[in-house]
Amino acid sequence: MEHSLNSLNNFDFLARSFARMHAEGRPVDILAVTGNMDEEHRTWFCARYAWYCQQMMQARELELEH
């Protein structure tokens, strides 16, 4: 169980990092990133990546408003 939790923490860190890169305008090939993941991890990773992208875009919009 602990190994699985560590894996999810690592995947979450990677999803956040790639979302930050995307928000900075750097190219991110999400298919290449997730290419070797099994379906369960790929689905989870892509959902987290999309969530972080959304959060970062909302934060950027708030910065531009002020």
Curated annotation (Swiss-Prot):
SUPFAM superfamilies: Glycogen synthesis protein GlgS. InterPro entries: GlgS, GlgS_sf. Coiled coil: none annotated. GO terms for biological process: negative regulation of bacterial-type flagellum-dependent cell motility; negative regulation of single-species biofilm formation. Belongs to the GlgS family. HAMAP family: GlgS. Major determinant of cell surface composition. Negatively regulates motility, adhesion and synthesis of biofilm exopolysaccharides. This is Surface composition regulator. It comes from Shigella flexneri. The lineage of its organism: Bacteria, Pseudomonadati, Pseudomonadota, Gammaproteobacteria, Enterobacterales. The gene is glgS.
